[in-house]
Amino acid sequence: MKENPLASRSDVHIFPDSSRVVALLFVAGQELGGAESRASSVVKRIVALPEADVRRRLKDIIQRFARRHRDIVAIFSQHAERVSNRLDPKADLSEERWLLLGASFTHEYSLEAAAVCNPSIVMHPDQSDVPEGAVRFVMSYRGVGEGHRSSIGFRTGLVGADGEITLDPREPYPMIGTARDGLFHRDVFHARLKAMGQDGESAAYVLDELPVVFSIEELEARLEILISEFDTRQDAHTIARHHRSIAACSYGVHFDEGVDISERVLWPVMSAEAHGMEDARFVLFTEADGTTTYLATYTAFDGLNISQQLLRTDDFISFDASPVVGAAAPRKGLALFPRRINGKYAALTRYDSETNAVCFSDTLGHWGRAVTFQLPEWDWEVIQLGNCGSPIETEAGWLVLTHAVGPMRTYSLGAVLLDLDDPTKMLAALKEPLLIASPEEQDGYVPNVVYTCGAIAHGDILVIPYGVADHRINFATASISALLKAMTTTEHPAIVAKVQHRRLEDLALEH
């Protein structure tokens, strides 16, 4: 398949850097999970070491690792505190022995040992001191490390007036943010409980007395009342357990302002994402009153099951995560529109795993049925379709980058145009891929894949960071006006009829 002249590749590339490491808690015996800890045995051995050996070993460790972390001594102390309950209360440890104890419960994790891929991009919240005609951006990306565990990292840079892309240098010390309790949304609880078959009288007894958005303290107060009435509500303990499991999916993360954005790492906090946070799709969302915030959906993976989560941030310093549920959000790939449409939130979805659709909601946490607007049509998309991030608003309509999978499991990027007022209507589409892996891009962790989780418009320039073979990141640009001009309405009458039939079915179910 020929390269599409609409897309121009940049010479800017991002490769995985195995030296990007964080120091994590390590507990012997629990490396693979499910096994019993050997922590007590390790503690006893540390306590029994001669003081001279302790000093010598600690000195060597600090010499080797201090340059790799901003404050390795503080990390050792934190990890020692985590296992201090295994110490004899009468034990009087020297500072050196305390730090060696912490070091024995610490290991390095290389965030990008396997890959960097699947980026999304938004305008930076700080556009001060930017050269004339340029804009500053924030790019999120998926880092894949040992055990194929994924995290979310960030890069910043500039797009010049001519579309030239420049990346800012990265600071050397990746940092995981501090987790805190999150806020909960009542509609999300109802939706999750309904899916479990547990949204009955007792659930209503808890939730109906809570505000639309509530805290963990407010939830626990209601659950205590429920449990106190277990003699008349025999499912009280079960309902309380379900509420707490849902609450565990909402949390906050905060970074110190002194930590550069290129050092901030969103790392799994809850059990539902223990094996990774994948494919964040960020968008700068604007309300009707002009206020803005950054939103993103991402896929939480526990090693077996996947679910969708929502991120919110105003500044990329503090983040709030909460679950996303509903018929239109069963697996992955929800991408939010950058504003409300007819008073409702809107999102792209691939709820059936192979077609593109739009859904609407009064809230960001619960999405009902979706309306299909695109079925696989061309030979390069016969296996499945999906979106590549949030739509971009143009005068002609919503510009949507899509991905398609064709023969030889080849991933390519396409584009469609949706109606501004009714995005369930597809106005036009590219007949050929906008971007497909070049010969130089075919090889990698997953061959023949190009994929993005979002693009931005800078004037008439469409800026597309994209993952290559699930291993590295490249950039491409395209003229938006030329892209729109190259689109055509679908030419297959049978496909047109199928889409219209599917759309009418979806609309009937919606109402």
Set out the residue ranges of the language-model regions.
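A conserved acidic, glycine/proline-rich C-terminal tail/linker
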Residues: 441-455
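Beta-rich carbohydrate-recognition and catalytic domains
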Residues: 1-275, 284-334, 339-383, 393-445, ...
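Donor nucleotide-activated moiety binding/catalytic core segment of transferases
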Residues: 380-388, 448-451
